[in-house]
Amino acid sequence: MSIKHWMSAPIAVATLFASQLLLAGSVLAAENNDRLDPRNDAFEQKHPDQYHSWKATSESKHIEDALSEDPNMVILWAGYGFAKDYNKARGHFYALDDVRQTLRTGAPADENSGPMPMACWSCKSPDVARVIEERGEDGYFSGKWARLGSEIVNPIGCSDCHDTRSEKFNQGEPELALTRPYVERAFDVIGKNFDDQSRLDKQASVCAQCHVEYYFTGPTKAVKFPWDMGTTVGDMEKYYDALDFKDWTHAVSKAPMLKAQHPGFETWREGIHGKNKVVCVDCHMPKVTKADGTVYTDHKVGNPFDRFEDTCAQCHTQTKEQLRNIVSSRKALVLNMKLTAEKQIVAAHFEAGEAWKAGATEEEMKPILQDIRHAQWRWDYAIASHGVHMHAPEVALEVLGTAVDRAADARTKLVRLLATKGITEPVQIPDISTKAKAQEALGMDMEKMNADKKHFLDTVVPDWDKAAAEREATY
């Protein structure tokens, strides 16, 4: 006799329901076991040396205010978030602290307010890869930056660069991985599918998930790399122009501006180190030998001169002092050209602003604004490539030289245009000798911005952390 012949209907339904619950529970358990773990301390036991060296990036506590060092940049980014504040990057340990604390992300009161999109988390946390897996790319990118503040809580770490769920990783191998689908697509565009790359290329590509140029596109403001026409400054400039893309409209000149992110990968590729397959980890994450003979990759990403014998000395025969002098001289050359370009571009912005006031038309201004756009894009591309004076100084100097040329083109046209409007005297530039004076010249209410940010950090962020702790307690 079959079960259905002797089992009553209520019992049958109850049995079926119970079996479904058991099945759902087992599936959920399997999903939880397979979930990407964004917590860096979850890998301390199996990878102690790597974990503790990564945690040592917390030693870079000092914050360097780049706008105070160079107030020109306040004017160059007028109307954009970087004019509010721009601090030099610290260690990976502080990635989340820094993006939460910067004035650029504003002081959102709820998940639907604030100036920035969700994409601004994309390079800051392994939680990004987790959320994309769980919700899809649209489910991650959609909305404002504050929407998933309680989900993005672990700083840059293990699951950003490694397949931490793989058997190889659990056995002690690095098992490098691209953890953002938009990065995989970008490498496919330039014919460098990650799975087909050499070990050295993979080591560089993993870093290129973040140390790279990108922009926000579409209704969700999703991250995309502008590599469709190539990876040089000129290639990407053509790409952006073809799309008629702009990051913002300059508050003084009204030029349609581009903001370079941090194209370290692109400039490295063009420099002597990249061309000779000397990759990021060779200089910034060297293999080191412990007293007991154990060899591991040091995850305290930092200045190669701090570990000279394990980095530079592996290839170079010069002394540490000799190499430091070479690098310092290159840095000085790049800095000098940087300031030269800034002087010209700042003047062009104010002269363009004066032209508008004098009655210039959009048709008259269009070629001038395009020159300003190109000049500042090239300046920004060079200076935003952290360490470019070491990675590719010749690229930096060439690109900055073209920035000066484009700015000169704009100013030459402006002189002629201003003359037709009856303005023949030099345009006066306000006092921008300090960060505060430059921000005041733009009418920025810094006292209010800082007060709003403090309120956000005191009231909103603690709620994010509390919700995250409750969620992660279930892992």
From Swiss-Prot:
Its cofactor is Ca(2+); heme c. Heme c 2 binds at C158, C161, H162, H299. GO terms for molecular function: calcium ion binding; heme binding; iron ion binding; nitrite reductase (cytochrome, ammonia-forming) activity. SUPFAM superfamilies: Multiheme cytochromes. One of its GO terms (biological process) is anaerobic electron transport chain. Heme c 5 binds at H273, C312, C315, H316. InterPro entries: Cyt_c552, Cyt_c_NO2Rdtase_formate-dep, Multihaem_cyt_sf. Pathway: Nitrogen metabolism; nitrate reduction (assimilation). It is found in: Periplasm. The keyword Lipid metabolism does not apply. Heme c 3 binds at H92, C207, C210, H211. Residues 1-29 form the signal peptide. Residues 38-57 are annotated as: Disordered. Binds 1 Ca(2+) ion per monomer. Binds 5 heme c groups covalently per monomer. Heme c 4 binds at C280, C283, H284, H391. Ca(2+) binds at E213, Y214, K259, Q261. Heme binds at C120, C123, K124. The keyword Magnesium does not apply. NCBIfam families: cyto_c552_HCOOH (TIGR03152), PRK11125.1 (NF008339). This is Cytochrome c-552. It comes from Vibrio parahaemolyticus serotype O3:K6 (strain RIMD 2210633).
